[in-house]
């Protein structure tokens, strides 16, 4: 009896009934800023830079870089494996600018630099007393310390820079009657800026281009940011009649 009992493989029996199992879990929602929240955030960063350029031109550059180049927070700080420098902005023979970084999994990648991001870089560099554009091999730190020399070496410091901007933007949103949006912004993290940049660009750029700039391992990851079809699907269903 015992031998007959053991011959029945419970795992195999479960697999035989696999048609009753869910084949795909609902993917977690991408956390990102709404267009309204981003408008308040970047406007706030620009206002902060105008009021205290010695401190907040850096804030404005950090916000632009996280959004426009989909950077992870670790890609802005000095680490034992990578020290981001101005010379990592490089122009090719056609005059196109790229940013070289080492990201997740110690993988090196090139990020295409938009005209708007290039202008943001020029503004930041001029505020630091540098030439408007980097020269090959330039070793100046990408995100400088306001006290002392060298680049920022702690993700905590970057979080502090971003959080200060988020808090100020949320305060402005409340003052303008956007209380719910302000509360959601108060819960945002630095990584939301990367998600926001990807989500906006994937609406009008080829997904393969966004995938490579973001450093995604596959297009399936990038596809998670595409919600235009989902919105259109719901809009087409909204006026369906039952009777």
Task: Identify the role of each PLM range.
Residues 4, 65-79, 204-205, 216:
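A short, glycine-centered helix-capping/turn motif at helix boundaries
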Residues 5-43, 148-149:
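Flexible interdomain linker/hinge and immediately adjacent N-terminus
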Residues 39-73:
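Basic, Lys/Arg- and aromatic-enriched nucleic-acid-binding interface segment
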Residues 50, 159-212, 219:
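Short, basic (Lys/Arg/His-rich) helix/loop patches that form interaction surfaces
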Residues 115-184:
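Active-site/catalytic core of tyrosine-dependent DNA strand-transfer enzymes
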């Amino acid at each position: 009896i015992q031998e007959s009992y053991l011959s029945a493989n419970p795992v195999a029996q479960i697999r035989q009934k696999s048609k009753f199992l869910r084949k795909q879990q609902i993917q977690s929602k991408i956390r990102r800023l709404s267009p309204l929240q981003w408008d308040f955030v970047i406007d706030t960063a620009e206002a902060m830079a105008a009021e205290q350029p010695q401190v907040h031109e850096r804030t404005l550059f950090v916000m632009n870089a996280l959004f426009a180049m989909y950077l992870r927070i670790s890609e802005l700080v000095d680490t034992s494996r990578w020290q981001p420098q101005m010379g990592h902005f490089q122009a090719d023979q056609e005059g196109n600018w790229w940013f070289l970084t080492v990201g997740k999994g110690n993988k090196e990648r090139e990020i295409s630099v938009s005209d708007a991001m290039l202008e943001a870089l020029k503004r930041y560099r001029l505020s630091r007393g540098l030439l408007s554009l980097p020269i090959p091999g330039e070793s100046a730190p990408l995100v400088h310390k306001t006290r002392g020399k060298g680049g920022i070496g702690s993700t905590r410091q970057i979080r502090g820079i971003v959080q200060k901007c988020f808090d100020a933007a949320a305060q402005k949103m409340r003052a303008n009657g956007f209380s719910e949006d302000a509360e959601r912004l108060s819960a945002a993290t630095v990584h939301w800026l990367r998600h926001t940049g990807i989500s906006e660009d994937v609406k009008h750029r080829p997904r393969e281009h966004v995938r490579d700039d973001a450093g995604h391992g596959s297009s399936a990851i990038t596809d998670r940011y595409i919600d235009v079809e989902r919105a259109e699907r719901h809009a087409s269903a909204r006026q369906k009649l039952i009777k």
